[in-house]
Amino acid sequence: MKTCITKGIVTVSLTAILLSCSSTWAAGKGGVGLAATRLVYSEGEEQISLGVRNTSPDVPYLIQSWVMTPDNKKSADFIITPPLFVLNPANENLLRIMYIGAPLAKDRENLFFTSVRAVPSTTKRKEGNTLKIATQSVIKLFWRPKGLAYPLGEAPAKLRCTSLADMVMVSNPTPYFITLTDLKIGGKVVKNQMISPFDKYQFPLPKGAQNSSVTYRTINDYGAETPQLNCKS
């Protein structure tokens, strides 16, 4: 599912609209898309890569990429090459991402975000203000240490749920970030939520919920939904 945020950027003779989305080759008939909706950087890997594709038949894009921390700051712990380049029409390129920072926690995943901004070129200067649309795709980047007790595939079933009056608490006792999708409490749909390793999240009991039972799916390393599970107490 895409989450898009828009904000206006005003320059001389230019009003730019910056769109921030997550996508997998989601460029439609003309634009820039990414080859993944999330990345996993396993400890010990020299680098990982992310494909970028320009599906426009005639518009080149300037591509700029960087890695961010969860508090929306640029991370100095990663290098992306090339950090800035022109992606010609109907063309693809690979971004290579390398971790150069200090050792991270060994008992859990760490979360970062990969940001790819695409600015279309303009070949003619029009009179007055022109509208220029840039896209900024932001996807999760998980740094995963070696030697975790079990693989990600076993983690979703380990979630535990507790009823608390008008709340339901979902606990994640695993070393993985787990994104809950198709989440229902008492048969009522609840907004998707990511729960950090060894953390918990309290959901208000939805209006009209028949009980506090919880069903959910999660997102795997490939961005696909896993089979539905019933949360155990």
PLM segments and residue spans:
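N-terminal secretory signal peptides that target proteins for export/translocation
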Residues: M1-T6
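Beta-sheet-dominated interaction scaffolds and their linkers
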Residues: A26-G51, P151-R160
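Short beta-strand and strand-turn-strand segments in soluble, beta-rich domains
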Residues: L62-Q64, M68-P83, I178-V189
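Asparagine-centered strand-capping/turn motif at beta-strand->loop junctions
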Residues: V52-S56, V168-Y176
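Bacterial N-terminal signal peptides
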Residues: T11-S20
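Intrinsically disordered, low-complexity Pro/Gly/Ser/Thr-rich segments with frequent PxxP/GP/PP motifs
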Residues: S75-L104, G187-N211
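Terminal connector regions
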Residues: A102-E154, L159, N211-S233
